[in-house]
A protein has these predicted regions:
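Periplasmic polypeptide-binding modules associated with outer-membrane biogenesis and secretion
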Residues: 1-119, 149
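Beta-strand elements of well-folded, non-transmembrane domains
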Residues: 11-13, 105-107, 117-119, 132-136, ...
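Transmembrane beta-strand segments of outer-membrane beta-barrel domains in Gram-negative
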Residues: 35-42, 52, 110, 162-257
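Conserved structured core elements
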Residues: 41, 58-65, 74, 122-126, ...
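Transmembrane beta-barrel architecture of outer membranes
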Residues: 48, 66, 94-98, 110-112, ...
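Transmembrane beta-strand segments that form the barrel wall of outer-membrane beta-barrel proteins
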Residues: 51, 84, 109-119, 128-130, ...
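Amphipathic, soluble alpha/beta structural segments
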Residues: 58-73, 81-84, 88, 148-186
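Secondary-structure transition/capping motifs at alpha-helix termini
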Residues: 73-78, 103-109, 134-143, 183-184, ...
Length: 257
């Protein structure tokens, strides 16, 4: 039986390096130790919240597995390895271990583009979209995302009685995902056990169709979490509202929507 003595978080760890880990200048926070280098990229609070291994407690392989799972959910973390080393015995003769949680940083930002063409019975069109992501916007592995999309399609044939001779769409969405359960008055232990993420988002969409012109505004507050070691996934929409406005429309269009 082994009890945990010191727990070190080693940021910017290089798996190919063979040098010994220098812990002489490690910082401390809530009885944990941090080897951060010159530019720490993630808050100490976030690291401690996702660690199930605690100083002074009995070694548990389940705590190790839960810690791996928790750090695997942090999108700014590319690589995690947990290493243990014997640390002798304390004054009561109890065997002790030191723990090293070795982390490597992933790329914080990404941009993706999409382009597509359409042909609907001879009516040609195209759509273009772009997505930007920052995986560590507040240095707690929060993911900020911004999406824009535009589409256009020409229309042919008899357009009498319609208000638009084309189909156009322009929309955007911004959101932030926190890798923890955010709600007032919750204990840290409960948040840690939930393995949940919290999503906030707002969106705006403008559409021109032959029968109407429509503007949609929306906002959402959602929770996502897993149970039974990730076998079950759950979604809960605490808030999901949409406001629809039709500045122009043909007669009778509302009855057909």
């Amino acid at each position: 039986r082994y009890y945990m003595r010191k727990i070190y978080f080693v940021l910017s760890y290089d798996p190919t390096a063979t040098d010994q880990i220098d812990v002489a200048n490690a910082g401390t926070y809530k009885n944990y130790y941090f080897v951060e280098g010159d530019r720490p990229y993630i808050r100490r609070e976030t690291l401690v919240e996702n660690c199930f291994i605690r100083p002074g407690l009995l070694f548990s392989s389940r705590d190790v597995d839960n810690t791996y799972t928790a750090f695997g959910r942090l999108r700014i973390v590319k690589y995690v390895n947990i290493r243990f080393e014997p640390a002798g015995r304390n004054d009561e003769g109890v065997n002790q271990l030191d723990c090293y949680i070795l982390l490597s940083k992933d790329k914080p930002q990404s941009v993706s583009l999409e382009l597509e063409g359409t042909n609907s019975e001879g009516d040609l069109g195209f759509a273009v979209g772009a997505t930007y992501q920052h995986r560590n916007i507040f240095k707690g592995s929060e993911t900020f995302s911004a999406k824009v999309r535009g589409a256009y399609e020409s229309l042919s044939g008899d357009l009498s009685g319609l208000i638009n001779d084309r189909y156009t769409e322009l929309g955007g969405e911004i959101g932030v995902t926190y890798p923890k359960f955010l709600f007032p008055f919750l204990r840290t232990d409960f948040r840690r056990r939930m393995k949940a993420s919290t999503e906030y988002s707002i969106n705006l969409n403008f559409q021109q169709r032959p029968e109407y012109t429509r503007v949609i505004w929306g906002a959402a507050w959602k929770y996502k979490w897993t149970t039974n070691r990730g076998f079950y996934r759950h979604n809960y929409d605490l808030l999901d509202i949409n406001y629809v406005y039709l500045p122009r429309k043909t007669d009778g269009v509302l009855e057909n929507i």
